[in-house]
């Protein structure tokens, strides 16, 4: 039941992520090398917002669709005594998800332009942007709605504070690590 719930929420924001990536690839002259992207938030503001929403949901940011399933899986894993190794591996996997999501956002939208092909703005094409906006809405509201539909009785899990905040702690630490690594690479490349 929990796996199906996670599959549904994950499918919604992952589909949004892939559609946004497709729009960026199409708009950047069909190049798929992320190093040639950079600064695309100026040309694709709506896609930037939608893709960041999907990334945040993938990372399990509270009150987005991914939070409801991912947090429940983490809490259930912490509740059962599977051993410290399994918990550590799970938290490392959560951290790696945040690392590559932040890297994707930085290289595509924040970082310097990588010198790829010319950018053709295609956000005015409603056949491309329409599904992205609809999936963005589902990434916002599908977590609680699917949770209420899948679990008629609320799932209450009692954990010690350090386990309850463990996932968010690892997410925050991995975010700081990624930002510092990006800063080091940027200063090494241009400094």
PLM feature spans:
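Active-site helix/loop module of the DD-peptidase/beta-lactamase fold
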Residues: 35-36, 46
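Beta-strand segments within the central parallel beta-sheet cores of soluble alpha/beta enzyme folds
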Residues: 36-39, 119
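Alpha-helical multi-pass transmembrane bundles of energy-transducing inner-membrane proteins
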Residues: 1-35
């Amino acid at each position: 039941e929990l796996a199906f719930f996670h599959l549904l929420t994950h499918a919604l924001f992952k589909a949004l992520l892939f559609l946004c990536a497709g729009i960026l690839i199409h708009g950047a002259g069909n190049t798929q090398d992320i190093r040639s992207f950079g600064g695309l938030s100026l040309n694709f503001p709506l896609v930037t917002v939608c893709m960041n929403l999907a990334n945040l949901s993938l990372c399990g940011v509270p009150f987005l669709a991914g939070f409801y399933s991912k947090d429940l899986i983490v809490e259930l894993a912490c509740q059962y005594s599977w051993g410290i190794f399994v918990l550590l591996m799970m938290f490392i996997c959560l951290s790696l998800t945040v690392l590559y999501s932040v890297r994707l956002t930085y290289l595509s939208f924040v970082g310097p332009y990588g010198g790829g092909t010319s950018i053709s703005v295609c956000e005015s094409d409603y056949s491309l942007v329409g599904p992205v906006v609809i999936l963005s809405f589902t990434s916002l509201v599908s977590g609680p709605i699917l949770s209420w539909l899948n679990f008629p009785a609320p799932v209450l899990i009692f954990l010690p504070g350090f386990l309850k905040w463990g996932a968010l702690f690892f997410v925050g630490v991995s975010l700081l690590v990624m930002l510092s690594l990006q800063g080091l690479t940027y200063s090494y490349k241009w400094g």
